[in-house]
């Protein structure tokens, strides 16, 4: 379908504080939004119309942090690395399809080991594979033996940094990823430890900027968060304020205020796994929930700008399950549905540098939107099963999504 009109849906454009009170029309032509409202009704020159009375139309969702190369059913790097390249590519195609069918129309892949996500991006763009708009970080820069070193991004000297940056740019990575601290997934790595001195992080950011790329910094420990901010990264991933006693135990409120005053965004990777940790076995609020809700709510109070992200692919976090992550995010950070939805649409688009293409329902942008049976600004549960997903103008209703096979 290259030219059609969606009529009688209530619209949330990705910016407003509430759902549109009146129904409206959206004209889609050649994969883009041609016009809205009265202009769409007056100027539409096609014949195909969809009467969406009772439906709620919102922008397609954005997950700002996933790992398509990872299988969430596997628990260790050794298990991940034991898979064959063909197995990995086949699973990546399935995950991409499942993400789009769940309403995720844009995502940023925050790291893998062989630039397979770049090939997947090309196949999606050529419409050979069903999947969302894909932004790729490539191999994360990490210290020798550091977090995710098995993906081949180990660097120490300035020359090694320059060579690794060049490798990512030559692969046509959209972003550069750096592991500013240790992580949880890598044996022998401690999440609170810094992996690079501030000067080295500065050189990574400067090198990326010369190539026209922003930097995403994996940061759990508080010192690593501070160093990444001062080095000038665009997004801080996780921002967990990990201390000796665990996540959310080394909070620095002055640093939070500094982040809030900056141009940096925080991508907190709250996901379905976090949702399963809200209560302990006795049904009381868990220690993890109390610590991380306090951490995120202090960040919010400090003026920090959040973007929705899940770290999908890590153990137990399915790539398509952004809706569950958004529900958990609302609880941990004490956000209203509209605040959560902005973080997963217009705000995420700005942070990722694609606001001229997507993130809002607006004339001139890509036709990326969802039609929902109920109002997501009243309850985020509305996101669990979109009636229709539209990506680059392609109409994917429930029946189409349920019978569509993954393209080989």
What are these regions (language model features)?
Residues 119, 160-240, 244-266, 283-306, ...:
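Histidine/acidic residue-rich metal-binding segments in metalloenzymes
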Residues 67-88, 97-100, 130, 138, ...:
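Active-site gating loops and adjacent loop-to-helix segments of metal-dependent hydrolytic enzymes
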Residues 55-126, 199:
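Metal-associated gating/positioning segment near the N- to mid-region
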Residues 9, 26, 31, 54, ...:
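Divalent metal-coordination and catalytic microenvironments
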Residues 9, 344-346, 350, 363-407:
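C-terminal cap of metal-dependent C-N hydrolases
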Residues 210, 289-372:
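His/Asp/Glu-enriched, well-ordered alpha-helical/loop segment
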Residues 1-44, 55-57, 374-379, 394:
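N-terminal metal-binding scaffold of metallo-dependent hydrolase/deaminase domains
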Residues 72-75, 117, 186-189, 225-233, ...:
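Histidine/acidic-residue-rich catalytic or RNA/ligand-binding cores of hydrolases
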């Amino acid at each position: 379908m290259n030219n059609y009109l969606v009529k009688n849906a209530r619209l949330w454009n990705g910016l407003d504080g509430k759902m549109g009170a009146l129904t409206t029309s959206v004209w889609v032509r050649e994969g883009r939004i041609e016009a809205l409202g009265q202009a769409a009704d007056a100027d539409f020159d096609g014949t195909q119309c969809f009467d969406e009375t009772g439906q709620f139309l919102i922008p397609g969702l954005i997950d700002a942090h996933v790992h398509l190369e990872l299988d969430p059913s596997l628990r260790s790097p050794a298990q991940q690395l034991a898979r064959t390249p063909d197995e990995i590519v086949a699973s990546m195609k399935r995950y991409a399809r499942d993400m789009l069918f769940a309403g995720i129309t844009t995502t940023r892949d925050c790291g893998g080991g062989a630039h397979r996500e770049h090939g997947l991006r090309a196949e999606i763009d050529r419409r050979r594979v069903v999947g969302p708009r894909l932004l790729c970080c490539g191999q994360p820069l990490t210290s020798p033996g550091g977090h995710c070193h098995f993906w081949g991004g180990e660097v120490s000297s300035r020359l090694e940094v320059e060579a690794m940056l060049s490798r990512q740019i030559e692969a046509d990575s959209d972003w550069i990823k750096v592991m500013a601290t240790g992580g949880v997934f890598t044996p022998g790595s401690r999440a609170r430890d810094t992996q690079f001195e501030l000067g080295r992080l500065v050189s990574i950011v400067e090198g990326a900027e010369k190539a026209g790329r922003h930097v995403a910094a994996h940061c759990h420990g508080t010192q690593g968060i501070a160093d990444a901010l001062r080095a000038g990264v665009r997004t801080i991933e996780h921002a967990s304020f990990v201390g000796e006693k665990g996540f959310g135990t080394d909070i620095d409120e002055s640093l939070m205020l500094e982040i809030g005053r900056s141009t940096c965004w925080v991508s907190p990777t709250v996901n379905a796994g976090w949702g399963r940790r809200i209560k302990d076995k006795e049904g009381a609020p868990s220690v993890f929930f109390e610590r991380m809700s306090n951490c995120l709510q202090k960040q919010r109070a400090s003026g920090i700008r959040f973007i929705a992200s899940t770290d999908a692919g890590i153990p137990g976090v399915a790539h398509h399950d952004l809706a569950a992550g958004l529900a958990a995010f609302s609880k941990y950070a004490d956000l209203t549905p509209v605040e959560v939805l902005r973080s997963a649409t217009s705000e995420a688009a700005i942070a990722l540098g694609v606001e001229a293409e997507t993130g809002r329902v607006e004339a001139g942008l890509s036709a990326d939107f969802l039609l929902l049976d109920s109002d997501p600004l009243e309850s985020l549960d509305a996101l669990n099963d979109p009636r229709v997903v539209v990506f680059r103008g392609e109409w994917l209703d429930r029946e189409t999504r349920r019978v569509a096979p993954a393209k080989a």
